[in-house]
Design a protein with these regions (language model features):
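Hydrophobic alpha-helical segments, chiefly the membrane-spanning helices
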Residues: 269-287
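Conserved small/polar residues in nucleotide/adenosyl-binding loops
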Residues: 257-268, 277-278
Length: 287
């Protein structure tokens, strides 16, 4: 039976998860990001060379499949900045990186709204990273989000983008007294990524299901920490996604099992909670 492990922070992030993930990747077939966006950075130091990744799973330096699943909000410029960085370091990306068709996209208007809101709050600001994560998740919940798969029908994509940015610009101009964004410029820029991102896009839920059913190990890479969870963290000073272990299920898709013996099998066999104390990272395993 495969052992699938989830690594999450037990505090507010920066607990040293990257080190643990790098260690556990060596016994895994796939490493999966299931929530958050490019707001959290995982630092890896390999042979003295430091690399900070915000979107691509830390396992990309190893010979494993790396999955950005549906629970992640995706900023395409950051994704391709990371791909370029890794390629310059001689890291193979092709056939290893897999991105869900269902990832909601982050646009410049999400970032503009994020920063405008923080500015308007003044001394009561939450302290977001200003990268559009919150507004992108707001659109997802409000059923306004544009998904990665929508980009492959240019006409439909531009119609969706026009509606979305009309709403965003209305808020920017009329509520936050900020400048509107150019819809056409954003549309042209994002459509320029279509051919580049297409080789990486797939139904990651089915892909992970096939890996799981082959009894291979899956490593779920949590971002941020438990105390930043939108439901269970120090609300309202939290992030906009669920960061606890349970988020791995909704953030990746259902995992089915086919077995003849009357046994119980779980998607996640172990949870590793990372804790930072006095400049040292510790981790605890729960099965």
């Amino acid at each position: 039976m495969a052992n699938s492990i989830i690594v999450i922070g037990a505090q507010w992030g920066d607990e040293g998860k990257g080190k643990i993930i790098d260690l556990l990747t060596r016994q895994s077939t796939a490493v999966v990001r299931f929530q958050g966006g490019h707001n959290a950075g995982h630092t890896l130091v390999i042979e003295g060379d430091e690399t900070i990744l915000h979107l691509i799973p830390s396992g990309i330096f190893n010979d494993v499949d790396c999955v950005i699943a549906n629970g992640v909000v995706l900023h395409l410029p950051t994704l391709f900045d990371e791909i370029t960085l890794l390629q310059k370091k001689g890291v193979s990306i092709d056939h290893k990186l897999h991105i869900s068709t269902l990832c909601p996209l982050i646009f410049p208007s999400h970032i503009a709204l994020d920063n405008a809101k923080e500015k308007a709050l003044g001394s009561k600001a939450i302290g977001t990273t200003g990268r559009g994560i919150g507004p992108a998740y707001e659109d997802k919940v409000a059923r306004r989000a544009i998904h990665l798969s929508d980009m492959f029908d240019a006409e439909r994509f531009l119609e969706q983008l026009n509606r979305l940015m009309e709403f965003h610009n209305f808020l920017l101009v009329n509520y936050y007294k900020a400048k509107p964004l150019d819809v056409r410029a954003v549309g042209d820029e994002w459509l320029s990524y279509t051919d580049k991102v297409k080789p990486y896009v797939k139904d990651t839920a089915l892909f992970l299901d096939s890996i799981n059913n082959s009894n291979a190990n899956i490593l779920f890479e949590g971002a941020q920490g438990t105390m930043l969870d939108i439901d269970h963290g120090t609300y309202p000073y939290v992030t906009s996604s669920n960061t606890v272990a349970g988020a791995a299920s909704t953030g990746t898709g259902p995992v089915s099992y086919t077995h003849s013996e009357p046994t119980r099998r779980y998607a996640i066999s172990y949870a590793v909670f990372c804790l930072k104390k006095k400049n040292h990272s510790r981790f605890y395993e729960v099965s």
